[in-house]
């Protein structure tokens, strides 16, 4: 089986689509079938690897990159419509 998603760090709660995925496509991660995507996801975009509650941080590269603004279910697209910058993440 050819992977269609990539987990960058073992602590990440999102994975990256290696190709455009359509709703219902099965994620193949680490050469195993994993779960279905819940909506169309563009190549290079994030997919929730697990359920993420509102206010929880989204981890990529093992670091918090954004915070969920609503519950995000496993298999959903993680993007600007359901996340915001991590409060206090940027100092000027």
Question: For each predicted feature, which ranges?
Answer:
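N-terminal small-residue-enriched
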Residues: 2-92
């Amino acid at each position: 089986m050819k992977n269609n998603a990539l987990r960058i760090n073992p602590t990440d709660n999102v994975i990256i689509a290696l190709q455009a995925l359509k709703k219902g496509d099965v994620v193949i991660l680490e050469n195993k079938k994993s779960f279905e995507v819940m909506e169309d996801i563009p190549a290079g975009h994030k997919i929730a690897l697990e359920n993420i509650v509102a206010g929880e941080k989204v981890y990529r590269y093992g670091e918090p990159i954004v915070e969920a603004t609503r519950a995000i279910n496993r298999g959903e697209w993680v993007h600007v419509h359901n996340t915001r910058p991590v409060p206090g993440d940027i100092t000027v």
